[in-house]
Amino acid sequence: MNMPLSLMQFAPALPEIFVLAMVSLILVIDAAVGDGKRYLAYGLSLVTLAGAAFLTVRDFSTLPVLALGGLFIDDPLSDVLKLFLYLTVAIVLVYSRDYLRVRGLYKGEFFVLALFALLGMMVMVSASHFLTLYLGLELLSLSLYAMVALQRDSSVATEAAMKYFVLGALASGMLLYGMSMVYGVTGSLALGDIAIVLQDGTDLRIPLVFGIVFVVAGLAFKLGAVPFHMWVPDVYHGAPTAMTLFVGSAPKIAAFAFVVRVLGQGLESQVSEWRDMLVILAVLSMAIGNIAAIAQSNLKRMFAYSTISHMGFMLLGVLAGSQNGYGAAMFYVLVYTLMTLGGFGMILLLSRAGFESDRLDDFKGLNRRSPWLAFVMLLLMFSMTGIPPTVGFYAKLAVLQAVVEIGYVWLAVAAVLFSLVGAFYYLRIVKLMYFDTPQDTAPIAPGIDARLLMSANGLAVLALGILPQPLMAVCVQAIGTSF
């Protein structure tokens, strides 16, 4: 039986439609049940992720398919990134469950906001039009603003949310202004049409360059790249750790998709205009991120500056402007997400009622309290540093190879030097865990599911480091087939 054309147009967006329907259902159910049945929202959220993953795998696209009048694209890049988004959000929910429960935050609002944010990210990775990109971005951003402020009785969280909102609104305005200037030059908001017009050349070089500058500035804010990084440390530190884990993981995958769609597809012919801007952003991010992280005594702020430096590293792959470069950047952002889940997840597992395990001193002597969790954290820190045989080493190597291929050897050397600086604060945590006396002697009792997931998280960092080729091949093939 053939579906009408109008319904066929919606077929590639079935995962998004399913998530939206389930969010609406969770809202209704959560409003109807009492506080004692909040686990329903948690369970239904995991069911939503599993259902969306099933639909994505069932209709996995091997070739790009435009839908909804060219506003939406279903291609291997979007499908692969969506699957990683589902996995990331599921891990966040499992890690966060006990943390939220003991702090009175185990409510439907968190799960609804998480799924709305996921929906925004799904729209972003499948957008082939500036309007769709912006719609997905704003849905994600508004969900994150509310999520950061969810702990209403915390003045620190409220302050962080206000900073995030004000700076985010400014960045969104810059991005929208840049899009309007590109539209003024090309006469289109569709990325494919923009690419065709710019390949033929244009006499309006100055407006186009200004438009690209504003677009890149808006993208840099969403990534947390220097000098648009001011919100990152305050939001990571001020928000409850469960919210920090969400903000610091899945949205980076969507931000990568945004960057590669806009720069790698729509503005591909203008690589000479945006490459130098990305070089500056990457160098500043690696420098300031790594140097500022050394001075931090709070682990969440340290990870915030670490994120800034990692985004600088990821931009190295993007500025290469090649299939290998984009593939390396995609591999890097997926690996970064895996490491971030483990790092913040460890803070969640070690925290308990009335105690936030977010200071460096809280990790002193962890090997005596829980040798296995200390070993998992060691693997995560080694991977963030880039020490073989963990996957962080291969991710950095792939990005550096892409940069060297375009002749930017000096940039690769600078990246290696900044990585050596970053090794100090990562290995400091290892030293605290294995050579210092524990200050906290309370038993560590995470749930069995969280403990198993953390173990898998750490071992995945090691396994992907030993066998990185399959995931790298998926990334390069997804980029090559989609572009």
Curated annotation (Swiss-Prot):
Q: Name one GO molecular function term.
A: NADH:ubiquinone reductase (non-electrogenic) activity
Annotated signal peptide: none
Q: Where in the cell is it found?
A: Cell inner membrane
Keyword Repeat attached? no
Q: What is its EC number?
A: 7.1.1.-
Q: Which Pfam families does this chain map to? A: Proton_antipo_M
Which Gene Ontology cellular component terms are annotated? plasma membrane
Q: Which GO terms describe its biological process?
A: ATP synthesis coupled electron transport
Alphabetized UniProt keyword annotations: Cell inner membrane, Cell membrane, Membrane, NAD, Quinone, Translocase, Transmembrane, Transmembrane helix, Transport, Ubiquinone
Membrane topology per the entry is: Multi-pass membrane protein
Annotated transmembrane regions: 13-33, 39-57, 76-96, 110-130, 131-151, 165-185, 206-226, 240-260, 277-297, 302-322, 330-350, 373-393, 406-426, 459-479
Name the catalysed reactions: a quinone + NADH + 5 H(+)(in) = a quinol + NAD(+) + 4 H(+)(out)
Tell whether Cell membrane is among the UniProt keywords.
yes
Q: Which domain of life is it from?
A: Bacteria
Do you know which HAMAP family this protein is assigned to?
NDH1_NuoN_1 (MF_00445)
The family this protein is said to belong to: Belongs to the complex I subunit 2 family.
* Functional summary from the UniProt entry: NDH-1 shuttles electrons from NADH, via FMN and iron-sulfur (Fe-S) centers, to quinones in the respiratory chain. The immediate electron acceptor for the enzyme in this species is believed to be ubiquinone. Couples the redox reaction to proton translocation (for every two electrons transferred, four hydrogen ions are translocated across the cytoplasmic membrane), and thus conserves the redox energy in a proton gradient.
Cite the record's note on assembly: NDH-1 is composed of 14 different subunits. Subunits NuoA, H, J, K, L, M, N constitute the membrane sector of the complex.
Protein name (record): NADH-quinone oxidoreductase subunit N
Q: Give the gene name.
A: nuoN
